[in-house]
Amino acid sequence: REFLTPPLDAAQIQAALEKLHSLDDEQPAAPRSARGRIINVLGSKGGVGTTTIAVNLAVELAGGERPASVALVDMNTLFGDIPLFLDLKAEFHWGEITKNIDRMDNIFMGKILAKHPCGIQVLSSPAYLNGHVAPTPETIEHILGVMQQMFDFVIIDAGQSTNDTCLKIVQMASDVLLVSTLSLPCLS
């Protein structure tokens, strides 16, 4: 476990990354058939930087020394920012899946995801109000199960949600990154 407090300097970040990398080297390599890791980036309140951390984590995992297959999921209920952060035009979003959950498989998922030049694939959130169908915990479990079979890492920008769907994501996650700031609203 590593906790970084601001102000951060490059040496502090580098030391934490090297420690993480050395721990990774100690783990035996998993066979490719193993399920991918789900990393849930959850904010203690809005505006703390969950999207920034999720996007940068996904880009680093996809293009680091040991590139991995990475999916980035924007679970902000409406108007998620991941396509904006990546300058990406997403044609589809997870609302399309919730309407067609019976068709969900690797092929359908592959057609829904937006591909970014850095190597990550993005499942964005709806960018409009009409026709929006919120995912249920069961739907999310199915979506993430398919994505775990397709990718080494599934990074989820969960925003600051605390509903049943968010609880299901936390339960399925291999790792949960709770993003906070040193302010009273974040602690309450």
Could you tell me what each predicted segment is?
Residues 64-122:
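Phosphate-binding loop that captures ATP/GTP phosphates
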